[in-house]
Amino acid sequence: MKVRPSVKPICEKCKVIKRHGHVMVICENPKHKQKQG
């Protein structure tokens, strides 16, 4: 999980979602997981 000021999809399987007011990227590849904060 990477915590970044700006989250962007890295590959085609990355999905940008909003959870509890946080923008997150979820993906099949665990290295692509990101969270804004």
Swiss-Prot record:
Coiled-coil portions: none
Superkingdom, natural source: Bacteria
The keyword Ribonucleoprotein is annotated on this UniProt entry: yes
Keyword vocabulary terms for this entry: Ribonucleoprotein, Ribosomal protein
GO BP field: translation
Molecular function (Gene Ontology), one example: structural constituent of ribosome
GO cellular component: cytoplasm; ribonucleoprotein complex; ribosome
SUPFAM superfamilies for the chain: Ribosomal protein L36 (SSF57840)
Family: Belongs to the bacterial ribosomal protein bL36 family.
Protein name per Swiss-Prot or TrEMBL: Large ribosomal subunit protein bL36
Source organism of the structure: Symbiobacterium thermophilum (strain DSM 24528 / JCM 14929 / IAM 14863 / T)
